Amino acid sequence: MIISRIILDGLAMSLFFNFGVGLFSFILPQAYSTMFPKEIKEAAAPYVVKKDVKKMYAIILSIYAAVFLFFGISTYFSGVTGFRNLFWTGYIEMLFVNFGDLLILDCLLRAVTKNKKGLIKGAENCKAWNLGEWMKAALPEHLLFWPIIFCPIAGLITAGIAILLSHIG
């Protein structure tokens, strides 16, 4: 494992993922409200268009696919070998995306969205916009769900792509 490369790849994909998701959250704000804390989600629900939610999920899945492909291809070309090393490379890189999500989307984007009154219709006066309330949902997600469930899945996908590429090339 090449730690400096893991850090740089993790940071690069963290920026790509989080700024990509952040950008589209301003294009389809009502759809993105479905991923916010419960109070905001419920307040915004009458204004959410199902077609926009489908677009949002297509965008997010496309961004995830690009991230996983980059991780797998980059790991393959870095010369990392062995399933354990490939897995941990993908895991650590996705951990960077996770913490970037916490800082960029859950802290920075929340503050920007909160200050743009009317961006998410119906949720303008929700208590869940306050940092403490928001973090009640964000911290368990980023300190438990991502490291225990999602990062290992990312590690498996990264290892799978790199192993597949090693058999092809």
Model features per residue range: what roles?
Residues 8-30, 93-112:
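Hydrophobic alpha-helical membrane-embedded segments
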